Amino acid sequence: GILDAIKAIAKAAG
């Protein structure tokens, strides 16, 4: 879902 995409991006940015 959209939240999963946000979490994935946040993890990649971290």
From Swiss-Prot:
The keyword tRNA-binding is assigned to this record: no
Tissues expressing this chain: Expressed by the skin glands.
Transmembrane segments: none
Chain positions with Glycine amide modification: G14
Subcellular location as annotated: Secreted
Protein known as: Hylaseptin-P1
Example of a GO biological process term: killing of cells of another organism
Main location: secreted
General function of this protein: Has antibacterial activity against the Gram-positive bacterium S.aureus, and the Gram-negative bacteria P.aeruginosa and E.coli. Has antifungal activity against C.albicans. No hemolytic activity has been detected.
Single GO cellular component term: extracellular region
